[in-house]
Amino acid sequence: MAFLKKSLFLVLFLGLVSLSICDEEKRQDEDDDDDDDEEKRGVFDIIKDAGKQLVAHATGKIAEKV
């Protein structure tokens, strides 16, 4: 009976260790993905701001002609 308990505890311990390692790798992968998303947002913000300035400049030119 003691042998079965020790074996069971060993299996559970090794399972918990492997789960924690997998969780750490998953968090690292998610952090890497977050960095990519931030870069994409940064580029989109630059394009959006340039578009706003272009529209403002164009509407200013149209208002001057009228």
UniProtKB/Swiss-Prot annotation:
Function (record text): Has no antibacterial activity against Gram-negative bacteria E.coli ATCC 25922, S.pneumoniae ATCC 700603 and S.choleraesuis ATCC 14028 or against Gram-positive bacterium S.aureus ATCC 29313. Shows no hemolytic activity and no cytotoxicity.
GO CC terms in record: extracellular region
Pfam annotation, one family: Antimicrobial15
The family this protein is said to belong to: Belongs to the frog skin active peptide (FSAP) family. Ocellatin subfamily.
Subcellular location: Secreted
Main location, first listed in the record: secreted
Residues with Valine amide modification: V66
Protein name, entry field: Ocellatin-PT2
Secretion signal span: 1-22
Record has Transmembrane as a keyword: no
Propeptide: 23-39
Key words, A-Z: Amidation, Amphibian defense peptide, Cleavage on pair of basic residues, Secreted, Signal
InterPro entries to which the protein is assigned, alphabetical: Antimicrobial15, Frog_antimicrobial_propeptide, FSAP
Keyword Signal assigned: yes
